[in-house]
Amino acid sequence: MKNIVITGGAGFIGSHVVRLFVNKYPEYHIINLDKLTYAGNLANLKDIEDKPNYTFVKGDICDFDLMLKLMQDYKVDGIIHLAAESHVDRSIKDPFTFAQTNVMGTLSLLQAAKIYWESLPEGYEGKRFYHISTDEVYGALQMTHPEGIPAPFTTKASSGKNHEAYGEEFFLETTKYNPHSPYSASKASSDHFVRAFHDTYGMPTIVTNCSNNYGPYQFPEKLIPLFINNIRHRKPLPVYGKGENVRDWLYVVDHARAIDIIFHKGKIAETYNIGGFNEWKNIDIIKVVIKTVDRLLGRKEGEDMDLITYVTDRKGHDMRYAIDSRKLQKELGWEPSLQFEEGIEETVKWYLENQEWMDNVTSGDYQKYYDNMYSNR
């Protein structure tokens, strides 16, 4: 049996990865390590919590002694590292916490893995440290075509008539790092540490940089779930600047699929970009979300457009992110399965049908669930 630690497994992306691995690989023991900060929620995994190949461990990746004990106690063969502080606005207000968790936490985990794996007779053979990062480490791309041009590459799941590019440059795996926010700077630093442990000690590592994710179980401080909830309750929709900033979007289930493929088939010491093969201006996304929520709630489609409220732009707000995922597509055969419009439809339906989850997360009541389930164990 392989013993795999997934850090941040109670979070948004992490919970989807944990669920996929627990269900797909019954011969694996999946250890979900999560500190359970505000964005971690064990209720995300109620459907698999009693599976025999699943274990939850509450812990902080910054606690080196705990990380080493975890490696030794569970005889860990692989690590999928998702635990991170990830909200840009929070990083602007509190950069220290982001450096502590994203940089020092990653270093703590790397060092614990190094010590344990090097103590084994087989050393690093059959081991793997997979670090999940962001496309924000690359900085910003110019929006040279604000009117949109035909996208130079596509997939079956690329957004139909709206599949456009807003510039001629894209982030490649070889693009130089140029982070602009405390969040992206902390992730860039952690990426460098992971690669340094391969180059210096021979640790088998892989790094991926992914575009914006959306889908079920995302904490409602992020754009799409926040706006779904606000539209439902007819609250203002704060839009930075003119809403012209461009992002590439990926449905979270497709990201989990990519992580699975890369963990098992990716080449050691390689970097892979993971993206949705689409670009959207923020204001256009918001309009799609409004129309979808209105329609599914039985309102006149688009009647809540007046909720859009333009606010002062974020400091250092990067104009355009656009990721080229063709390396992953060509080498490992992965590509997104859902068009953006299809993913938004599924996402809006989920949030509207799971209002209790939303209410519990925003009120903090989900912490009671953890206490009831684990405090006496």
Show where each model-derived region lies.
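N-terminal Rossmann-like NAD(P)+-binding domain of SDR-like oxidoreductases, especially those catalyzing
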Residues: 1-213, 263, 282, 346, ...
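C-terminal substrate-binding subdomain of Rossmann-fold SDR/epimerase-dehydratase oxidoreductases
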Residues: 4, 17, 30, 59-62, ...
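Residues at alpha-helix caps and immediate loop-helix transition turns in enzyme cores, especially N-
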Residues: 41-44, 94, 219-223, 285, ...
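Short, well-ordered secondary-structure micro-motifs
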Residues: 43, 142, 218, 250, ...
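Intrinsically disordered, low-complexity segments enriched in polar/charged residues with Gly/Pro
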Residues: 74, 84-85, 170, 215-216, ...
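The catalytic Tyr-centered alpha-helix of NAD(P)H-dependent dehydrogenases
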Residues: 179-186, 216, 220, 224, ...
